[in-house]
Regions:
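Positively charged n-region of N-terminal signal peptides that target proteins for export
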Residues: 1-6
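C-terminal motif of bacterial Sec signal peptides marking the signal peptidase cleavage site
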Residues: 13-16
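Conserved nucleotide-cofactor-binding alpha/beta core module
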Residues: 117-238, 265
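Class I SAM-dependent transferase core
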Residues: 19-125, 134-137, 141, 155-158, ...
């Protein structure tokens, strides 16, 4: 009897050990493959077609510089407009950006940029940062440094943030009165003014380098102004009348204090 009990106990222990081994062994592998996350694909540029139409329109209006056209095609204008105007980002007209200011008509941006005849390595001053779009266009042309001044504090801050976000490291934004230029970094190889004073500001002429180019609209507010291109040749300023344009007024203490003054237009 004892022998039978011993045999039964032994069989029970062996069964228990077998159960322990089964529970601690590796889990059974499933043959079903896990569902993989979808691989992200490159989004189609939603503005590509509109931008191409705009570039063709700018070309038809007379802009021929291939480098300028390339840059106009690559700088994302929709990043520089207010959200309520996104649908018009690549239409060929100015748009409000707040504070009584506008982002210029793309054709005007391209034309004025072409007039500067920029070469790689040149230093450029922009008066009237606005949204920062014109400064981005200038920087994309390969200029080493772009200096830009905006009188409206809120716009200067917004432009700085936007340009940094888009990776423009060679654009320096200053909040201040553009009438007096940026003498600490003068002379400049090119100066572009995106608001219209009623005269040619003398400080900007003084900050132009030899062979430097200055593109600026000049004229009374509320009327058609004249776009001028000035070139410094052997210390003398030569001016070229390029026809009628319409810009927002050049504001600030400097323009008001010197209203009707400035350098005589040659």
């Amino acid at each position: 009897m004892k022998t039978l009990v011993s045999i039964l106990v032994l069989l029970f222990l062996l069964a228990a050990c077998s159960q322990v081994v089964t529970e601690t062994s590796a889990p059974t592998m499933t043959t079903q493959k896990p569902e993989l996350a979808a691989t992200p694909t490159e989004e189609t540029d939603p503005y590509e077609q509109e931008r191409q139409v705009l570039i063709e329109e700018i070309k038809a209006m007379g802009v021929k510089d291939e480098a300028v056209l390339r840059v106009m095609d690559s700088v994302p204008r929709h990043e520089f407009v207010l959200s309520e105007y996104l649908g018009q980002a690549y239409e060929n007209h100015p748009l409000p950006i707040g504070y009584g200011q506008t982002i210029s008509q793309p054709y005007i941006v391209a034309w004025m940029t072409e007039l500067l005849e920029l070469e790689a390595g040149e230093k450029v001053l922009e008066i009237g940062t606005g949204s920062g779009y014109q400064a981005a266009v200038l920087a994309e042309l390969g200029t080493v440094e772009v200096y830009t001044i905006e009188i409206v504090p809120e716009l200067a801050e917004l432009a700085t943030t936007r340009l940094e976000k888009l990776g423009y490291t060679d654009i320096y934004v200053k909040q201040g009165d553009g009438y007096y230029g940026w003498p600490e970094y003068a002379p400049f190889d090119a100066i572009i003014v995106t608001a219209a004073p009623d005269h040619l500001p003398a400080p900007l002429v003084e900050q132009l380098s030899e062979d430097g180019r200055l593109v600026i609209p000049i004229g009374p507010q509320g009327w058609v102004q004249t776009l001028w291109k000035f070139v410094m040749v052997e210390g003398e300023l030569k001016g070229y009348n390029l026809g009628g344009v319409q810009f927002v007024p050049f504001t600030g203490p400097g323009a008001e204090e010197h209203q009707g003054e400035g350098t005589a237009i040659p």
